[in-house]
């Protein structure tokens, strides 16, 4: 029975890539800087001491990071018995965003340039805004700027609740984000607005990767919080991914846990499972692994590393989340039997010690585990697409256009 379990630790980079200068990210190192802070005792909020990741270490995380940066992460076990295949991979996609990283993992790198809203203030074209107001019958809008999602809620959420005007904002990514209160504005109404925005952006040829619904609750600054009802409206990948090929060529199953389905615009997904938070995502993944049949991919995105800790530049929070993931990892590994393959990786970096709030251009770990996987170093992978090619070869799919099989 052939089954692949892909776990994306969203934003878990292991050192700046060779082209990081193009992004202003030379020296960024998500894992390395978290480990440094823990070892120095400056990440003791809600946890304490050196970063403790014994299970990831046995899969080769520390050695992959050392190969990427030249430095072994502070506090991790240098003498761990390696039980998995490990490598570090660089991205060839033009951006450092979520769709680019995920599509490349699935064998389809983004070699075109996304469109971006580059102006910090008055970020969106007036023509686009006027169309949204007219089509969605809005009383107006707030924001129209670059911002962190949590900061803008403290600034504008009260006014939004009073006026019914949605909050429009963007970032360094190719995104149009809309924040609205779940109760005063309504979740369905927010989703409808996002559908309209997606249509206008596509028809207007803006080449924007995602429209993101950002629902929130709360009643005053300091207690506004985003809910788990986020919804991403992405464009479709420009070529068939390993997900679509498994379904089309083998009649296989692809189970999305978390936001995977949204990232691939639902293409190549046969089942969607919603879950919010690391524990809930883990529980949902284990349940799907228990029922997975032949020719199945279970694909989970652990978004909290990125959204709750990376973008918010929360080093102790990121460290605690990694330690939680590591504690639960044996539950997952014990379900990897026979011909099964488990792949742990990331889609980009988001160094919580870095300036600003955006992603960082980094290499990512590629950790592969299975009863028939030969442990050891598999070197530097020149593209995330090596993961996709590995999966294609494993299932006997037609080869992908990019990448070389790792195993």
Swiss-Prot record:
Primary subcellular site in the record, as a coarse category: cytoplasm
Pfam families hit by this protein: Metalloenzyme
Protein origin, superkingdom: Bacteria
Entries under InterPro entries matching the protein: Alkaline_phosphatase_core_sf, DeoB, Metalloenzyme, Phosphopentomutase_DeoB_cap_sf
Record-linked SUPFAM superfamilies: Alkaline phosphatase-like, DeoB insert domain-like
Coiled-coil segments: none
Binding-site list for Mn(2+) 2: 306, 311, 359
Cofactor(s), names only, from the UniProt record: Mn(2+)
Record keywords: Cytoplasm, Isomerase, Manganese, Metal-binding
Cofactor note: Binds 2 manganese ions.
GO cellular component annotations of the record: cytosol
EC nos: 5.4.2.7
GO biological process terms held by the UniProt record: 2-deoxyribose 1-phosphate catabolic process; 5-phosphoribose 1-diphosphate biosynthetic process; metabolic compound salvage; nucleotide metabolic process
Gene3D superfamilies: Alkaline Phosphatase, subunit A, Phosphopentomutase
Compartments reported by the entry: Cytoplasm
Pathway: Carbohydrate degradation; 2-deoxy-D-ribose 1-phosphate degradation; D-glyceraldehyde 3-phosphate and acetaldehyde from 2-deoxy-alpha-D-ribose 1-phosphate: step 1/2
Reaction equation(s) it catalyzes: 2-deoxy-alpha-D-ribose 1-phosphate = 2-deoxy-D-ribose 5-phosphate; alpha-D-ribose 1-phosphate = D-ribose 5-phosphate
Single GO MF descriptor: magnesium ion binding
Binding annotation for Mn(2+) 1: 10, 347-348
Family from the record: Belongs to the phosphopentomutase family.
Chain's role: Isomerase that catalyzes the conversion of deoxy-ribose 1-phosphate (dRib-1-P) and ribose 1-phosphate (Rib-1-P) to deoxy-ribose 5-phosphate (dRib-5-P) and ribose 5-phosphate (Rib-5-P), respectively.
Protein name: Phosphopentomutase
Organism field: Pectobacterium atrosepticum (strain SCRI 1043 / ATCC BAA-672) (Erwinia carotovora subsp. atroseptica)
């Amino acid at each position: 029975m052939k089954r692949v379990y892909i776990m994306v630790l969203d934003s878990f980079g292991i050192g700046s890539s060779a082209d990081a200068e193009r992004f202003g990210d030379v020296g960024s190192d998500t894992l390395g800087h978290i480990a440094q802070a823990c070892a120095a005792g400056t990440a003791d909020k809600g946890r304490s001491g050196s970063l403790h990741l014994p299970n990831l270490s046995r899969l080769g995380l520390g050695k992959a990071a050392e190969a990427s940066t030249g430095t072994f992460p502070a506090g991790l076990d240098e003498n761990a018995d390696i039980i998995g295949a490990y490598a570090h991979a660089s991205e060839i996609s033009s951006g450092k965003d979520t769709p680019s990283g995920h599509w490349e993992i699935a064998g389809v790198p983004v070699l075109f340039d996304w469109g971006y809203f580059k102006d910090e203030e008055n970020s969106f074209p007036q023509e686009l805004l006027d169309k949204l107001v007219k089509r969605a019958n809005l009383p107006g809008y707030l924001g129209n700027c670059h911002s962190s999602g949590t900061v803008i809620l403290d600034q504008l959420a009260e006014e939004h609740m009073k006026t019914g005007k949605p909050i429009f904002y963007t970032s360094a990514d190719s995104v149009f984000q809309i924040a609205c209160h779940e109760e005063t504005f309504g979740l369905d109404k927010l989703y409808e607005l996002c559908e309209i925005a997606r249509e206008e952006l596509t028809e207007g040829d803006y080449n924007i990767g995602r429209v993101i619904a950002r629902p929130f609750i709360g009643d005053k600054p300091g207690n506004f919080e985003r809910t788990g009802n986020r919804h991403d409206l992405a464009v479709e990948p420009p070529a068939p991914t390993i997900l679509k090929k498994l379904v089309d060529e083998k009649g296989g199953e692809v189970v999305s846990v978390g936001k995977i389905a949204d990232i691939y615009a639902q293409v190549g997904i046969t089942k969607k499972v919603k879950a919010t938070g690391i524990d809930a995502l883990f529980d949902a993944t284990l349940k799907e692994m228990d029922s997975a049949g032949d020719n199945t991919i279970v694909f989970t995105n652990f978004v909290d590393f990125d959204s709750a800790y990376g973008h918010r530049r929360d080093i102790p929070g990121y460290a605690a989340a990694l330690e939680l993931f590591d504690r639960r990892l044996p539950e997952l590994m014990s379900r990897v039997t026979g011909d099964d393959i488990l792949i742990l990786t990331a889609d980009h970096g988001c160094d919580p010690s870095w300036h600003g709030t955006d992603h960082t251009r980094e290499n990512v770990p590629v950790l592969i585990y299975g009863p028939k996987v030969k442990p050891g170093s598999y070197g530097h992978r020149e593209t995330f697409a090596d993961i996709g090619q590995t999966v294609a070869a494993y299932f006997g799919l037609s080869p992908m256009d990019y990448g070389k099989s790792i195993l």
